[in-house]
Structure formats: structure tokens, C-alpha cells
């Protein structure tokens, strides 16, 4: 089993990688760049864990973002561990909404729950899991709590569902679905979105003309496709926050 560990910078991702793999690690470089590539073997199993560079989105604007995109498109990934900073949950969930589009099973490691509690942030893990349709495990890399629960979930009850929620309105979602059906490759939904966004890196590589669809979406929403996608992701995140997050009075 191949596991991709993905999250924002400073989310505790590398600390979690160390806790999951111990001394069973190899360090190299990603092709073409000097960024470290860390891989390890998950404790009590033979699953491979890859510590991907910290990113905030899957736009093609940095080496780190391109590495993560390319990895998810080119490698056979069985599971994503998406580590989230509990003290910045809305910012963290933006990347989560983009990871949905790869249709890869996912588990969320909700880190820094102890710090969030100290700051008066209350996160209902069950409500968060239900709102996202993703298993959520609260952890603290600093205090090393929840790590055994996370490993147990991965090894004994490995998530396999990719039945993620539809978060975009129509006609945007309908256009994404229609475009995805025309693509004879994996990660269809992610690539369909990138085509409709006219992604500077991926769109030129895909032989499919979606210019008419882009114009229809622009005319309907009175905004560019990228702006519409971002707005609807943020709207979804706000709904999730209202369901699962509260502040101590």
C-alpha cells in the first residue's frame, strides 16, 4: 500500500511522518529540484508512506505544488493522509476540497487539537467527519496522542470510499462531470477542473477543446472559472465550519 502524506506547511506533517515511520526512512531528492523526498515504512505494516512537500493549494505556482500534483497524477496512491492544523481549520480545508477531486481514499489527521482547545476552539470530530464524508482522527504530534488510533485505522480498517460530497453548483458541476467523462485517464475530475480553469501546466497537455464550455460558464456566473471554483470551495468550508466548529464563550 502506498500512502501520500499531504498538508499545509507548518501543519506538523513531517512530525507526523516521523511518528508513523520511526527510523524506517529513506531520504532523496524529487526529480529536477533540490527538495527532499522522504519515504518510510509505516510502523507495524509494510505500507510505504511518502512525505510530500507542504502546500496550501494545488495550483501550479511553485515547485512544491507541482511535485504534489505530479505525484498524485503519476503514482498509484492507495490512501491520502491529509493532516490539518486544528487552529487554522478553514485554511487547511481548502486543500482538502481539492484533494477530493482525485477520487483517492482519504483520512484526515486533525493535528494540534490540544492547542485549538487552549485557544477556545471546539471541533466536533464526528460532525466534521460526517460533513466531509471522510474519517477524521484527532491527534497531537507534540504530545504523541492519537497516533496509535491513526495507525490502527490505516492498517485494520483502511478507508476505501471515495464517495465525496458534491460541493459545486450547477451548471459548473454538470460541466465538470461531462468533461471528465471524455477523459480516458485517471484523476478525471481533477483534470476536468484544470481544463476548465485553463491551467497553464496541464491544459496544453490534454487534447480536448473546452473553450465553448468555459465561455458558457463565464457567461452564467459572470466570473472566471477559477474564481467560481474558489468561491464555492470557501462556501462549502464555511458550512462545514458552522456544523463542526464552535468557540468557547
Question: Which stretches of residues belong to each language-model region?
Answer:
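Conserved residues at beta->alpha junctions
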Residues: 7, 83, 141
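Alpha-helical transmembrane helix bundles of large polytopic membrane transport and channel proteins
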Residues: 107, 117-248
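Conserved C-terminal guanine-recognition region of P-loop GTPase G domains, centered on the G4
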Residues: 40-43, 67-136
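Conserved G1/Walker A P-loop phosphate-binding module
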Residues: 1-61, 74-75
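Alpha-helix N-cap/helix-start motif
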Residues: 28, 61, 92, 118-121, ...
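Conserved nucleotide-binding/hydrolysis micro-motifs of P-loop NTPases
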Residues: 32, 54-55, 86-89, 112-117, ...
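Residue-level signature of catalytic and energy-coupling elements of molecular machines
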Residues: 16-17, 35, 51, 68, ...
Amino acid at each position: 500500500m502506498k500512502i501520500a502524506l499531504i498538508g499545509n506547511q507548518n501543519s506538523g506533517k513531517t512530525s507526523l511522518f516521523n511518528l508513523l515511520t520511526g527510523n524506517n526512512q529513506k531520504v532523496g531528492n524529487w526529480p529536477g529540484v533540490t527538495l527532499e523526498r522522504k519515504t518510510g515504512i509505516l510502523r507495524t505494516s509494510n505500507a510505504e508512506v511518502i512525505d510530500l512537500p507542504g502546500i496550501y493549494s494545488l495550483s501550479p505556482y511553485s515547485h512544491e505544488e507541482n511535485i504534489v500534483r505530479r505525484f498524485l497524477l503519476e503514482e498509484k496512491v492507495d490512501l491520502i493522509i491529509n493532516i490539518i492544523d486544528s487552529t487554522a481549520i478553514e485554511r487547511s480545508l481548502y486543500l482538502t476540497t481539492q484533494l477530493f477531486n482525485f477520487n483517492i481514499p482519504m483520512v484526515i489527521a486533525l493535528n494540534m487539537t490540544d492547542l485549538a482547545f487552549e485557544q477556545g476552539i471546539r471541533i466536533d470530530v464526528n460532525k466534521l467527519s460526517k460533513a466531509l464524508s471522510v474519517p477524521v482522527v484527532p491527534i497531537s504530534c507534540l504530545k504523541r496522542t492519537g497516533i496509535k488510533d491513526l495507525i490502527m485505522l490505516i492498517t485494520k480498517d483502511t478507508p476505501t470510499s471515495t464517495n465525496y460530497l458534491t460541493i459545486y453548483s450547477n451548471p459548473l458541476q454538470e460541466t465538470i462531470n461531462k468533461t471528465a467523462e471524455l477523459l480516458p485517464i485517471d484523476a478525471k475530475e481533477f483534470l476536468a477542473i484544470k481544463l476548465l480553469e485553463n491551467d497553464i501546466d496541464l491544459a496544453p497537455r490534454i487534447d480536448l477543446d473546452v473553450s465553448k464550455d468555459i465561455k458558457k460558464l463565464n457567461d452564467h456566473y459572470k466570473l472566471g472559472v477559477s474564481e467560481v471554483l474558489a468561491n464555492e470551495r470557501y462556501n462549502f468550508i464555511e458550512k462545514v465550519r458552522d456544523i463542526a466548529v464552535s468557540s468557547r464563550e
